[in-house]
Amino acid sequence: IGSSGVIMPTSREELANAIQGYPAAPLVAGSTDFGLSITQQLKNVEKVISLSAMDSLKKCTKTEQSLIIGAGAPLNDIASPLLSAFPQLAELITRFASLPIRNQATLGGNIANASPIGDMPPALLALGASLHLDNGQQVRVIPLKGFFTGYRQTQLEKGEWISAIEIPLLSKDNNVAAYKISKRMEDDISAVCAVFNLTLVDGVVTSLQTGFGGVAATPETCPTLEGALIGKQWQSADCLHLGKQMLKDAFNPIDDVRASAAYRNQVLSNLWHRFWLENQANNAIETR
């Protein structure tokens, strides 16, 4: 792509006009994934719409209820406010690809790419995040849960882009853990990613939100597990065994170069066991 093929809007209005004028042009921010289609797959692209000059997409705001992250902000730029509010995501952030990639890659791109093995969607699902979708005329806010409709397919409508990601802040009763399993510690894609967000009141489960990657065609939650544990004593072994069985029944992962389906199912079971152990109040242990 020559310089004449890159469109760089600087405002919401310019971006909406660019999308309307070039509906086939892909939107790119850091281009850390899209760029591979050109350098490795030799894809011929006539026009791209770059979001790198859209300062309005790079803001990060914290309210009393939530953290609102601009979809076009590089991951390294948002790492500090994100980890300040959600320190449990440190492993995911620090192991996300590599430092040069994190200087370019954006949270919005990681979501819009709709990869089943993206690192951040499982965490955002478990945290109950919402997306701000803009078309230049109005912004609609939808839950991330349900946004992924199929393999690399989303609820984005014609002319829309992700402008921000809104994440509710945690309470003192939230117990969150994020686990990434990959062949390499750094610069690798998840074989399995699992994130759990558990709320306990007097040892009783009042809420459970989940997020998973690498086990289905899209980033997923496990609604059956989330509903089945409500009202149960977390310390009970029933929670452990019920969770293992429901996770086994919920997903049908595939065999690929990163892991076999059997391995992925076993890892899910092991991670649930680990999470259950780590959150036993009378037997607090560190497994990291």
Where do the PLM segments sit?
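C-terminal structural segment of proteins
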Residues: I1-R288
